[in-house]
Amino acid sequence: MREDLLRNSVEFLREKTVLDAPDVKKIEFLKSKGLTAEEIQEAFKLAKNPLFPSYPRFENTSNFVSRDWRDWFIMGVISTGFAWSAYSLVKKYIAPMFRAPSQNAYEADKNALDAKFLEAHKILENLDEQTRKLSERTEKQQDELDIALDDLEETLNTLKRTSENRDREIARISQDVYTMSTITLPQSLEQIKKSQEEALQNLSREISSLRCLQTDSKKDDTFATTSNSSIPVLENPLDTSEGFQTKKVGTASLPDWQISMHNEASKNIDFNDIDPAESYVAEDAY
C-alpha cells in the first residue's frame, strides 16, 4: 500500500469538519484522490482508532492554598514594575513616532526643503544653460556643414563643367588633328611640293638663261678681241653714275639691252657656287 497516501487519508477522515459528513461523500472523495477500495477500508479502520490511549481520570481532591496580603503585595510590585517599564519604553521609543513635530522641527524641515529646492533650481538652470549652449553649438555646426556642403557642391559642379569643357576641347583638338592629318597637311604638303617644283623650274630656267648669256658673252668677247685692229671705236663714255657702260661700235656687236642685262646678271651671280647636278636637272626640265 501507499503509506503516504494512506496516512493523508487517515488525517483527512479525522478532521472535525469531515467527521460529521456522510461516509458516501468521504469514499467518493478518497476515490477521486486515487485510493483503492482496500486502502479506503484501511483508512476508515485507522481513523476510527483513538489517537491517544485512554487513561482513567483522577479528580484533583487537593485544596487550593489561600493567598495572604504579602502575596498580593509582591504581585502588585512586580506588576507595577512591568507596567512602569512598558510605559517607559512606549514613551521613549514608540510615542515619538506618533507625536507631532515642534515648530522648530517644522522650520528646520522647511529650511532643508528650501535648500533642496534652491539646489534643484540651480541644477535645472545649469542644465538649461548647457542645453542652450549645446543647441547653439549644434546650430553653428549645422550652418558650417551646410556651407561646406554648398562649397563642395559648387566645387563638384565646377569640376564637372571643367571636365566637360576639357572633353569638348579634347574632341575639338582630336577633330582638328584628324582634319589636319587627313586633309590640311596633305594639301599643304602638296602645295609646298608644287611651290618647290615651280621654284626649281624657275630657277632652272634662270640658270639656263644665265648659262646662255654667259656663252654669248664669251663669244662676244672673242669676236671683239679679233676685230679691234680693223674696226674703229667711238670713245664716248657715258656717265657711270647713271649705270651705263662703254659701247663697242662694230659690225658684229650685241644690242645694248642684251649687254646691259648680261653685265647686271654677272655682277649678282657667282657661277662657281652652282652645283653641276642641279644645272643638269634644270637643263633637263627646261
Swiss-Prot record:
A motif (SH3-binding) lies at residues 61-69. It comes from the Eukaryota. GO terms for cellular component: cytoplasm; peroxisomal importomer complex; peroxisomal membrane; peroxisome. Its main location: membrane. GO terms for molecular function: signaling receptor binding. Residues 122-214 form a coiled coil. Pfam families: Pex14_N. GO terms for biological process: protein import into peroxisome matrix, docking; protein targeting to peroxisome. Keywords: Coiled coil, Membrane, Peroxisome, Protein transport, Translocation, Transport. InterPro entries: PEX14 (IPR025655), Pex14_N (IPR006785), WH-like_DNA-bd_sf (IPR036388). It is found in: Peroxisome membrane. It is a peripheral membrane protein. Residues 218-239 are annotated as: Disordered. PANTHER family: PEROXISOMAL MEMBRANE PROTEIN PEX14. Component of the PEX13-PEX14 docking complex, a translocon channel that specifically mediates the import of peroxisomal cargo proteins bound to PEX5 receptor. The PEX13-PEX14 docking complex forms a large import pore which can be opened to a diameter of about 9 nm. Mechanistically, PEX5 receptor along with cargo proteins associates with the PEX14 subunit of the PEX13-PEX14 docking complex in the cytosol, leading to the insertion of the receptor into the organelle membrane with the concomitant translocation of the cargo into the peroxisome matrix. Interacts with PEX13 (via SH3 domain); forming the PEX13-PEX14 docking complex. Interacts with PEX5 (via WxxxF/Y motifs). Belongs to the peroxin-14 family. This is Peroxisomal membrane protein pex14. It comes from Schizosaccharomyces pombe (strain 972 / ATCC 24843). The gene is pex14.
